[in-house]
Amino acid sequence: MKHSVHEDKSDYFSNHTPAGKETRLPEDCVKPTRETCLPEDCVNPTRETCLPKDCVKPLLETRFVKVFDLQYEDGKHYYDATRHSSGDIAATKNEAAFSEMFPDAVSCVVILCLPNREPLLLFSYEYRYTVGRYLLSVPAGLIDPKDKESSTRDEALINTAVRELREETGIEIKSEDKVTVINPCLFSTPGMTDESNALVCAVVHTDNLHELSQKGAVGSEKFDGFALFTKEEAAAVLRNGVDPNGHFYSVYTLAALLYFVADLWK
């Protein structure tokens, strides 16, 4: 745990300012702020700084990815790679819409409970085209529009998780299993994209690991087997910072390892 150290600087300026020296900043050194694209009604004491939709300019639009120029300030450009239309990106949402937004996808922390064995954390090796390798990955998938028709956001996220587990692992969720939402919306890399994932935990009771299957992969999905870790083995992957193949892994794999090792699923 990190502890903040607060230095008492109450006498700093009095002790370091020459006697009689004017310390106030001259008025001619104060420059007016640049005119921005944000209207006054979009900046309030709650720090709501939603971007007006007319300040979002399209640069690239493909089936799966779009890139927009977010013009918060004249002459400055911030680029957002997103799955959303210009009117639905996170930057344009007010506080109410932002707090209720759906993530793009669901990532699953999957823990297998077997008779007379310690629990195991389940991963797959999935090919990730942007890094050109099979990475240690959690089961995950995009939320379908039909999922959003559920009565609550959590229900929609759980429905997505159940479907993805079936497709990517062959696991069928049963009544004795437990599927819960850990976090409804996590940003992956907010410095360049508003892509987001929910994190869902599935505690699955099984007595047959041979039922695991990746035959349900769809589209461009490519898998190369599973990885099962005990708590001790998962902790070793955390300490090493790479998977057993020596490859780095995603932040969602890191989250799954931490959640499992810390026993937060119990």
Walk through the language-model features, giving the residues of each.
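N-terminal leader/linker segments that precede catalytic domains of diphosphate-processing enzymes
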Residues: 1-135, 142-167, 171-212, 231-232, ...
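Phosphate-/nucleic-acid-contacting segments
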Residues: 217-237
